[in-house]
């Protein structure tokens, strides 16, 4: 089916920063996508094109990316008359039009907006939900697998003020079958956590971080984990909920010294207390022995490959690569060869097209890895990732706290999909890491 119109505009994400929205019009109507944005980004991610004009939006404007869609991509793609159902051909054309290795000419935010909208147009032409179209593109088998939800209920690092080192502390309901019940459990723990945080640290401690989690001014991971365990108990869900963490350690890695500064938000940090990677690895193991931690994301810096491989040898939980792998097949291949981690955090805007994101997931699955589909800290009302996680059959999604409408939009889409599928789905449960292999 021919594309009759492509139009991009600048809209706003959840942090109030500009981002790219793309409309594609075909005979089935208008199909819209909005591109998310990250705060703690890997240096190897595809290029997010920003204007750089500090007098407007602090340099974060996207008028160049919008113009690239309207003035370059739109006329070229319409003229090419590609079938919207042929996602790989469309994405290959977009990459060829850009002509750079990292999408620096047109911008990954321009290209991805078009790629996402194309996928929605294709699903509409086929008369199927987006998750079913994604499943067709990925070649995944049925039934669909429902997921291990990672809800970021406590924010630190670059996503919040205060001195808390680690960026995300997540809860993951893992014992019940119904998606609706797992979302309910997460919401109940979150409400208890807010109440406990305010009681312990004062009313302002219940304020939100970028991703909807509470952001109290606490100092250590142990404080954060104790709060979460207490909230789980107060909600009556002890034993039913696990914990995951995103350390985002690239944010506090000191490259010159090859050490990790656990007090990186303090300008007067004591260098004598900085840790080597074996020392940091022991800290993680100690935390995992004390708390029900099942997954750790970015435990080491993105280029500290030796540290990752060292940790992988002894780790008995999921080790997730985000900044390390940036949803890029080349980095995923290296991580597989070096035995650096055993799971991929899949962020479509890190690589810039739907096709490349699907291929990254397939590479990870092929190595026996888990795949966790993820939002970004600068999110929007677009719910595409909810359909992607179902279509890929990955069994894991990270879309964070049950607060703020841009986060809840994904949970609400998950509920709709669950209702639509009825009993035609499986629950990953404690087998979330290998959900792709689950069959009736």
Swiss-Prot record:
Which residues does substrate bind? 159, 168, 297, 322, 374-377, 398
Write out the pathway annotation from the protein's UniProt entry: Carbohydrate degradation; glycolysis; pyruvate from D-glyceraldehyde 3-phosphate: step 4/5
The protein's Enzyme Commission number: 4.2.1.11
Q: Which organism is it from?
A: Cochliobolus lunatus (Filamentous fungus)
Please state the protein's primary subcellular location: cytoplasm
Record's catalysed reaction(s) = (2R)-2-phosphoglycerate = phosphoenolpyruvate + H2O
UniProt entry tagged with the keyword Magnesium: yes
Q: How does it assemble?
A: Homodimer.
Gene3D superfamilies, sorted: Enolase-like C-terminal domain (3.20.20.120), Enolase-like, N-terminal domain (3.30.390.10)
Cofactors per UniProt? Mg(2+)
| Compartments where located | Cytoplasm
List, alphabetically, the HAMAP family matched. Enolase (MF_00318)
Spell out the GO cellular component terms annotated for this protein, sorted alphabetically and separated by semicolons: phosphopyruvate hydratase complex
| Cofactor comment text | Mg(2+) is required for catalysis and for stabilizing the dimer.
Give the CDD domains listed for this entry. Answer: enolase
> What is the name attached to this protein's record?
Enolase
Q: Where does Mg(2+) bind?
A: 246, 297, 322
> Under which main EC class is this enzyme filed?
lyase
List keywords of the entry alphabetically: Cytoplasm, Glycolysis, Lyase, Magnesium, Metal-binding
């Amino acid at each position: 089916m021919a594309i009759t119109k492509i139009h991009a505009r600048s809209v706003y994400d959840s942090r109030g920063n500009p981002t790219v929205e793309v409309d594609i019009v075909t005979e089935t109507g208008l199909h819209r996508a909005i591109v998310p944005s990250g705060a703690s980004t890997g240096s190897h991610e595809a290029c997010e094109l920003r204007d750089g004009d500090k007098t407007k939006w602090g340099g974060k404007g996207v008028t160049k990316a919008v113009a690239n869609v309207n003035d370059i991509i739109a006329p070229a793609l319409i003229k090419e008359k590609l079938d919207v159902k042929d996602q790989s051909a469309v994405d290959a054309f977009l990459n060829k039009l850009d002509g750079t290795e990292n999408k620096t000419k047109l911008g990954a935010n321009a290209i991805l907006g078009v790629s996402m909208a194309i996928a929605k147009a294709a699903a509409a032409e086929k008369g199927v939900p987006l998750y079913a179209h994604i499943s067709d593109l990925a070649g995944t088998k049925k039934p669909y697998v429902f997921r291990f939800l990672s809800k970021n209920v406590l924010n630190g690092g670059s996503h919040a003020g205060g001195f808390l080192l680690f960026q995300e502390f997540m809860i993951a309901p893992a014992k019940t079958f119904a998606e609706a019940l797992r979302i309910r459990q997460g919401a109940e723990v979150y409400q208890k956590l807010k109440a406990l945080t305010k009681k312990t640290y004062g009313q302002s401690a219940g304020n939100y971080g970028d991703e909807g989690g509470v952001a109290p001014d606490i100092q250590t991971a142990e404080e954060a984990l104790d709060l979460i365990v207490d909230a789980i108990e107060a909600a009556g869900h002890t034993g039913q909920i696990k914990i995951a963490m995103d350390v985002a350690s690239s944010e506090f890695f000191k490259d010159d010294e090859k050490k990790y500064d656990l007090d990186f938000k303090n300008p007067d940090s004591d260098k004598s207390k900085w840790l080597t990677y074996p020392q940091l690895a022991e800290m993680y193991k100690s935390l995992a022995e004390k708390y029900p931690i099942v997954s750790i994301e970015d435990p080491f810096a993105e280029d500290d490959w030796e540290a990752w491989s060292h940790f992988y040898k002894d780790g008995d939980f999921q080790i997730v690569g985000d900044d390390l792998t940036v949803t890029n097949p080349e980095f995923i291949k290296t991580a597989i060869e070096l035995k650096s981690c055993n799971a991929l955090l899949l962020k479509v805007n890190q690589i810039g097209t739907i096709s490349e994101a699907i291929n990254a997931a397939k590479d990870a699955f092929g190595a026996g890895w888990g795949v966790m589909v993820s939002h970004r800290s600068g999110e929007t009302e677009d719910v595409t990732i909810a359909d992607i996680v179902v279509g890929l059959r990955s069994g894991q999604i990270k879309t964070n706290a049950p607060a703020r409408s841009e986060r809840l939009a994904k949970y609400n889409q998950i509920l709709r999909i669950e209702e639509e599928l009825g009993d035609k789905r499986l629950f990953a449960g404690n087998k979330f890491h290998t959900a792709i292999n689950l069959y009736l």
